[in-house]
């Protein structure tokens, strides 16, 4: 900001979220600056002065972005709309975002709509009756700001958001996903999702979630599918915050793991939240009741993987995130089925890790959250057994991730030893050797070759 003050030739103001966050004492690295003149000149001058990069963000609106080369901060420079800063602020979404501070901080806040008073009351209020008509995305932004800031929403604004929610269908999917991500990864994500429900936004942007409402489950569940899904998300968030409560010696390793970047500017922990939201997405369409009255959801894991991928495709998420969340849905039942096989053979552990690769750790954590959120009949003993197995598999998954098991010889060596050409048969035998090695059944090259010769198909 000091650099911008030095290069500004025309009146300019810091506006929007940066002013709000400064008033709240919150750190920010994202600034909007409204200039009464040429935004391009100010952006380029700032870039030269700060050793940053400037480029046009919207040529139609004359908006330029300046980004620090190390991506520590960014500034969007935009021309004032209307004849004055007050008129410009009148086109903004909420009063807490409709404040301006003269560049350099000399002079009073420009606050024509009572944003400071709303900050003190921790309240979100629209600037004008047309706020949601001008940009329907503001309905989602309302939920996002409410959960990020912990603010309430005044009744008139809630009513206007509810009236405008259907128009979210007209908003570009990329913009919807940008807001939805911030809601899902917020500390108060459940509050944000509840507000989305209250204004009708969920029905438009995540109808798969809405369809879970009222879908009753078996006696082993104490909640319908929708409330169970919210509870699984709550357990995932709790695991992020305090992994030691359930994961014991693996807590530190899990914390590091969840902090790793994955895709779409999400960490693995944040992507796991999307897995929690979508892992049971296919339950409404797979629900059946047997003649004995038992509720089943056969195939909801495979169908859910397809549905989860479809949701994220619609939102224009990256291929990596789509595949990741789909894999979580596909494999989230595996651990639960294995509880009945305890004590596990090494081959069973190998097959679990191999089948779930590369989401072994992620899906094990999702399974823990899923089990903790299932507290129907006989749940206490079931949870104890599930967590006991989960800790075993989590340790194995973390070790696998550090060093994937390998057979005692390479593929080319095996091909020469048993006289096979590269192809499907050789790949099958290598996989068998890897499993046998993991199980401790072979450890030397000679043992591997002997087993391979037994495994070669006679034809």
At which residue positions do the language-model features occur?
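Catalytic cores of the polymerase beta-like nucleotidyltransferase superfamily
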Residues: 1-459
């Amino acid at each position: 900001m000091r650099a911008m003050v030095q290069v500004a030739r025309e009146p300019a103001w810091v506006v929007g979220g940066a002013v709000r966050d400064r008033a709240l004492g919150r750190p920010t690295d994202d600034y909007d600056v409204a200039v009464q003149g040429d935004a391009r000149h100010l952006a380029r001058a700032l870039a030269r002065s700060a050793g940053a990069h400037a480029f046009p963000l919207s040529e139609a609106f004359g908006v330029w972005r300046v980004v620090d080369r190390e991506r520590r901060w960014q500034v969007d420079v935009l021309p004032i709309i209307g004849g004055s800063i007050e008129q410009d602020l009148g086109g903004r979404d909420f009063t807490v975002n409709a404040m301006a501070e003269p560049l350099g901080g000399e002079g009073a806040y420009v606050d024509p709509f009572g944003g400071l008073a709303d900050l003190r009351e921790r309240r979100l209020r629209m600037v004008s009756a047309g706020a949601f008509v001008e940009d329907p995305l503001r309905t989602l932004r309302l939920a996002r700001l409410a959960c990020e800031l912990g603010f309430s929403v005044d009744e008139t604004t809630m009513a206007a958001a509810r009236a405008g929610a259907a128009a979210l269908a007209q908003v570009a999917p990329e913009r919807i996903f940008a807001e939805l991500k911030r809601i899902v990864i917020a500390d108060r994500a459940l509050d944000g999702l509840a507000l989305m429900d209250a204004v009708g936004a969920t029905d438009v942007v995540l109808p798969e979630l809405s369809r879970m409402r009222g879908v009753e489950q078996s006696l082993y569940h104490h909640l319908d599918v929708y409330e169970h899904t919210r509870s699984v998300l709550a357990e995932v968030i709790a695991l992020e915050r305090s992994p030691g409560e359930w994961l014991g010696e693996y807590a530190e390793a899990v914390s590091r793991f969840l902090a790793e970047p994955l895709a779409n500017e999400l960490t693995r922990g944040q992507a796991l939240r999307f897995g929690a939201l979508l892992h049971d997405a296919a339950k409404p369409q797979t629900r059946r009741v047997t003649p004995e009255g038992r509720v089943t959801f056969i195939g909801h894991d495979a169908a859910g993987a397809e549905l989860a991928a479809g949701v994220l495709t619609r939102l224009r998420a990256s291929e990596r995130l789509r595949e990741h969340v789909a894999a979580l849905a596909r494999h989230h039942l595996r651990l639960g089925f294995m509880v009945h096989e305890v004590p596990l053979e090494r081959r069973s552990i190998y097959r679990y890790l191999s089948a779930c690769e590369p989401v072994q750790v992620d899906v094990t954590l999702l399974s823990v959250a899923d089990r903790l959120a299932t507290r129907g009949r006989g749940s206490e003993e079931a949870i104890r057994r599930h967590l006991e197995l989960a800790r075993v598999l989590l340790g194995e998954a973390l070790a696998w991730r550090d060093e994937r098991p390998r057979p005692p010889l390479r593929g080319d060596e095996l091909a020469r030893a048993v006289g096979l050409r590269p192809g499907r048969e050789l790949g099958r035998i290598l996989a068998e050797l890897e499993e046998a090695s993991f199980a401790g059944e072979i450890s030397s090259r000679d043992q591997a070759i002997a087993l391979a010769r037994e495994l070669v198909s006679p034809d």
